[in-house]
Amino acid sequence: MALLQIAEPGQSPQPHQRRLAVGIDLGTTNSLVAALRSGLSEPLPDADGQVILPSAVRYHADRTEVGESAKLAASADPLNTVLSVKRLMGRGLSDVKQLGDQLPYRFVGGESHMPFIDTVQGPKSPVEVSADILKVLRQRAETTLGGELVGAVITVPAYFDDAQRQATKDAAKLAGLNVLRLLNEPTAAAVAYGLDQHAEGLVAIYDLGGGTFDISILRLTGGVFEVLATGGDSALGGDDFDHTVAGWIISSAGLSADLDPGAQRNLLQTACAAKEALTDAATVEVSYGTWSAQLTREAFDALIEPMVARSLKACRRAVRDSGVELEDVGAVVMVGGSTRVPRVRDAVAEAFGRQPLTEIDPDQVVAIGAAIQADTLAGNKRDGGELLLLDVIPLSLGLETMGGLMEKVIPRNTTIPVARAQDFTTYKDGQTAMMIHVLQGERELISDCRSLARFELRGIPAMVAGAAKIRVTYQVDADGLLSVAARELASGVEASIQVKPSYGLTDGEIAKMLKDSFQYAGDDKVARVLREQQVDAQRLLEAVQGALDVDGERLLDAEERMVIDLQMQELAELIKGTDGYAIEQQTKRLSQVTDAFAARRMDQSVKAALAGRNLNELEE
């Protein structure tokens, strides 16, 4: 039975006039659902009064178990109990195999590249597992609120790529949820703290969850949230702290690292319990089998220090990307259960020179903020005015051009939603089709970027090279999902694609791509210039050869032809090398020695066009 909500006079939520919408934090370790009740955003409890739902799903032959009971069965039934499924969202089968023994499951492949977990209930994809968690949250919300939901705002890490976001939307659809918006977790946290109404200036959102780390720098101005930069590590979280403590136990106890799935789960649960105990205690007794030892907070801090340092390095990079200084940041919001670790809080305070905001439960803050946004998007009037959320894309989007070059159409950290168009042309005479290769990344060469999709534009009118104009439009919606369209402007023929890869980036790939873009920036620029010079030279060679085939014998004498042939041979040889300056100079020389030939061809074309026409016809 739904509980009756009693409000103070003048604060009634007018239930019959409000549309029911919720915010959902679909987390790696835990998940929550929240909603606005009596004007306040709060997490919704289950029948036992618990607001946190462990992100654990256990499959039986005839039923599915979700939450705390499933989590407790993980050691006894590791092959049928799925934990931390968020880490598998948008991944390929080859990606999860690289994780090796970290995942005690049997994986099988499907028709898509998506990994399936082999259970007694049959193969289960990460999308299906996530959907089972979302179904429980949806049912909890509808029972508590006493009605059917019009939709939900689901939060995702700011660093989630296109495939991971799409997988999240697919899971929601499977769970019977209408997704009003995918909202970046850092932005949701800022909304929860009411920073949209009370703050002006720069805010850092430090989000360390079970499986991912995000850092976002936001500028708040009059209710407008502008995300200046995002960063993080998609392979850093509380799970990694657990694995580190588990490694310490194995080493200290002299155990074999080759454990069966049940023993592995049991070990990780022991490590997690020790980590959580050290949040309040200075020392904890750790027992595993017949072995036991003391683990001090000081020793634990030393174990996790490399990971804490990695998070701070990402913070400094995000601050640099946003064009501000650390001391300019006015507030730091802590998000995610792993920010309860004292060393994490101390390190963040030291880095930013101020104590972080921790008043709202870090496990609940994201869902609370998402619920506020959901209520607004559902069409309910929000006290205190509207807020505008301006999120950004984490990596540049572009396409392949001749020479294997990456041409950026939308740079990283561009505010979304966004649409950008750029004009391109054909490379060869008579070209009637063009392959559009959609890429993501920061490097200059396509071999160093990630391929998202390919599609072909056909029906381009046959023209000389460079005459056709193809407009390529990239559009990223508010959920961070990309669609690309190409249109030939003269004929109107067009083609488009919604980019929906079957799997996403591997662990840490986004962070690695950003790191590489800085590390190899100089080399990339040199390589790009070389490729461009090679393409220009090749284009000139083909154009000259085409002209020679048509008019060479008629308009050139033997000596002129020999000079041009020699210059062409020299340029053709230089293109095979890596001396960009020499290619550029030889291209200029070939262009100069063919100037007279080009002028004669132009004269011949004009004479042919005017042949048989009188002056009066021309004046008309």
From Swiss-Prot:
It comes from the Bacteria. The keyword Nucleotide-binding applies. InterPro entries: ATPase_NBD, Heat_shock_70_CS, HscA_NBD, HSP70_C_sf, HSP70_peptide-bd_sf, Hsp_70_fam, ISC_FeS_clus_asmbl_HscA. One of its GO terms (molecular function) is ATP binding. GO terms for biological process: iron-sulfur cluster assembly. Keywords: ATP-binding, Chaperone, Nucleotide-binding. Signal peptide: none annotated. PROSITE patterns: HSP70_1, HSP70_2, HSP70_3. Belongs to the heat shock protein 70 family. Chaperone involved in the maturation of iron-sulfur cluster-containing proteins. Has a low intrinsic ATPase activity which is markedly stimulated by HscB. PANTHER family: HEAT SHOCK PROTEIN 70KDA (PTHR19375). This is Chaperone protein HscA homolog. It comes from Pseudomonas fluorescens (strain SBW25). The gene is hscA.
